[in-house]
Design a protein with these regions (language model features):
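Metal-dependent de-N-acetylase/amidase catalytic core
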Residues: 1-127
Length: 127
């Protein structure tokens, strides 16, 4: 998966997206068979979520999985404590992510689906 928040004011997400996309296109053009089974899934980022009608895959998370995700975020130095590009939101990265994922789970519950602790949403990028 890859961040699909191309409105990132510092351009990090779009630079990474283009690097991954070019690598995938190169592998595809070289005819490697395994690439036919690879899909590129984009998550939105810490600040926003995809609109519910845009989401193509949603991964439900239990409270334990939310904690594991938080610990995964802590592993990345750029996402710990005060991040270099904080923006106007004073919360730490993991706090924004957990609220976003909980809100997505609530949206699905409001539609009549099972209510989970959190849900990560993805959109597939065709390359």
């Amino acid at each position: 998966d890859l961040a699909g928040d191309f409105a990132d004011p510092h351009g990090t997400h779009i630079v990474c997206f283009h690097a991954v996309l070019e690598a995938l296109k190169q592998i595809k053009s070289e005819g490697d068979e395994w690439i036919k089974d690879c899909w590129l899934w984009l998550y939105k980022g810490a600040w926003e979520e995809w609109n519910i009608d845009e989401i193509q895959m949603a991964i439900p998370m239990s409270p334990d999985q939310v904690l594991r995700k938080r610990h995964g975020i802590f592993i990345h130095q750029s996402q710990k404590d005060m991040v270099p590009f904080q923006g106007s939101d004073a919360r730490e990265f993991w706090q924004r992510v957990e609220v976003r994922n909980a809100n997505t789970a609530r949206l699905y519950a409001d539609l009549g689906l099972t209510h989970y602790a959190a849900m990560e949403a993805f959109v597939r990028w065709e390359y």
